Amino acid sequence: MYVGRIVAVGCSGDAVWVGYRVSSRSFPNRRATASGSSVFVHPVDPSDVLKNPYITYPCIRASNDFAVVSNGDHTDMIFDRIEDGSGPLDAVALSLVAYGYERDDLRTPRIAGVVSGRSAVLGIAAHDEIRVRKIELQDGDAWMVATYEKTGFEPVSMEGASASSIARSLFGLPFERPVCSAAAFRRDDGFELAVYNPR
């Protein structure tokens, strides 16, 4: 099954995490790169951006207290609104309403997630609906939403005790055409970031 981009949130022990995976048919030559407290998805060939403006973006941004994950530039808006005092649910909802779905041929949904404390928020903006849900996380929980097929908020079997292991676990989910993945994992002093690029 091809599900496109995947946003995941979860909890391992006392640590919450977010994860992101690129699965792609059209632009598989992409990588995830960590820089500071953010992870960026970008094409190997920068000129590919001229063919599709949606293929490069910050997929994860983290502060000491929360982490945001999404499949587009709305990562920044969600992060900034939470920094300015909005709750995660409101920040995700407002940002998805503001951005809407991607204006490409497939009308690709925008998806997003936030973890803060022991709570998570997942959201999706499709061409015909916008949905946002708050989830209270328990140890071992993992939830996902994807751009195609798996567009509901559903539990997924994943585990890991670090950003690196979460990124690899997400990459290994049994969905077609994985390209790269990334994760942010809560530590005592903030969020640890990791990326997985198999080639």
Curated annotation (Swiss-Prot):
Its EC number is 3.5.4.10. It is an enzyme of class 3 (hydrolase). GO terms for molecular function: IMP cyclohydrolase activity. Gene3D superfamilies: Inosine monophosphate cyclohydrolase-like. Pathway: Purine metabolism; IMP biosynthesis via de novo pathway; IMP from 5-formamido-1-(5-phospho-D-ribosyl)imidazole-4-carboxamide: step 1/1. One of its GO terms (biological process) is 'de novo' IMP biosynthetic process. It catalyses: IMP + H2O = 5-formamido-1-(5-phospho-D-ribosyl)imidazole-4-carboxamide. Keywords: Hydrolase, Purine biosynthesis. Signal peptide: none annotated. Coiled coil: none annotated. Belongs to the archaeal IMP cyclohydrolase family. Catalyzes the cyclization of 5-formylamidoimidazole-4-carboxamide ribonucleotide to IMP. This is IMP cyclohydrolase. It comes from Methanothrix thermoacetophila (strain DSM 6194 / JCM 14653 / NBRC 101360 / PT) (Methanosaeta thermophila).
